[in-house]
Amino acid sequence: MFIGFDYGTANCSVAVMRDGKPQLLKMENDSTLLPSMLCAPTREAVSEWLYRHHDVPADDDETQALLRRAIRYNREEDIDVTAKSVQFGLSSLAQYIDDPEEVWFVKSPKSFLGASGLKPQQVALFEDLVCAMMLHIRQQAQAQLPEAITQAVIGRPINFQGLGGDEANAQAQGILERAAKRAGFKDVVFQYEPVAAGLDYEATLQEEKRVLVVDIGGGTTDCSLLLMGPQWRSRLDREASLLGHSGCRIGGNDLDIALAFKNLMPLLGMGGETEKGIALPILPWWNAVAINDVPAQSDFYSSANGRLLNDLVRDAREPEKVALLQKVWRQRLSYRLVRSAEECKIALSSVAETRASLPFISDELATLISQQGLESALSQPLARILEQVQLALDNAQEKPDVIYLTGGSARSPLIKKALAEQLPGIPIAGGDDFGSVTAGLARWAEVVFR
């Protein structure tokens, strides 16, 4: 049996075809979405959990070496890896919030798969993380289906996050493919996420149109100009319908990070001075919220940065504020900070102003964020997104008849306004912002696996 599988940066979802229509399956708490989060007692627990409780093979030398190190480490630390040691989605977030110092937590593993300079053991670790999530998702889907799931069309961005170009894309897709096969999928095919979103929209068209798909996901923005319509449905070879593509490593997570940096970090002393009037360095505050940047997070949570923060507290004109950043370092609160910014971004899609409260850092710590503040904070990443729209059109040398906007950030009035200003007079359509890619992947799975 086949599925469409959106292994997303922000959320994961699965769809099957029933009576000619895609149907998303339940993943967690009666929702069709599983937030892309995972927690465990230690990083090493994930590898042992796969082997000990799910008989997932360690196929090559690097994954075997990782497994041996993991088992040895967990034994030395007296950590008993049980069937429930690894949690996913909101369950993992709840455990992390309850005890951030004792829980190893990761959000959006997909963000790191195309990172440059990953060592073989780091690639093996990310493969295990992805495999664990895919295994869990496959099990959730399997419980709702009568036949064994063996085939999947998995979505991928035009360009994964990372600076390595084609090499980064090959690295990331390789991790996804190996992880999927270790998780039990025998046949795996990849499809570009904006193309998949377009396929779902195509099902509503009565005539051929040039459709500009703008898919703003958690980690990437992907744009495709596609010829779509009844005559293209069910055609395995659609090369002639693909007019232009572009993609950049800017997505919803980057919007959340930018909002946290500009609007929340000043509460923690960013922009302050020493007693001598010298500006404090900005980098520690940026690294604290750059949750999709492995080197930045490693640097922030290093012992050397802990010593630097001690020095900054000692020298700052407002040491009590910088001490709050020190608390973020000590209690590993980066994800909670960015999560607070995300909640404000979502709220500002329907209200003019919202209050950001950070009681997990300090009881009274709060600030108001307005639509104007949001627009100012997001100006740079938004400009990058609009560049990709223009690049896709330049590659195609054609104008769209309609814009199909999808992805988790598609609901933002700010983004719709910017697109309308860039392409005046062209209608903007939307669908299921969180499910259109998954539905399109299921439609494509029906074409390739039927």
Describe every region a protein language model picked out.
Residues 118-119, 146-147, 269-273, 343-354, ...:
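Intrinsically disordered or highly flexible coil/loop and linker segments, enriched in small
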Residues 1-34, 70-213, 229-248, 365-366, ...:
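N-terminal phosphate-binding loop and flanking beta/alpha elements of the actin-like ATPase fold
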Residues 10, 219-221:
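Conserved Rossmann-like nucleotide-cofactor binding loop
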Residues 35-40, 64-65, 228-360:
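Phosphate-binding glycine-rich/basic clefts of nucleotide- and phosphate-handling proteins
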Residues 20, 29-76:
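Extended N-terminal export/anchoring regions of large proteins
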Residues 261-270, 421, 425-428, 443-450:
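Short, well-ordered loop/turn and helix-capping segments at boundaries between secondary-structure elements
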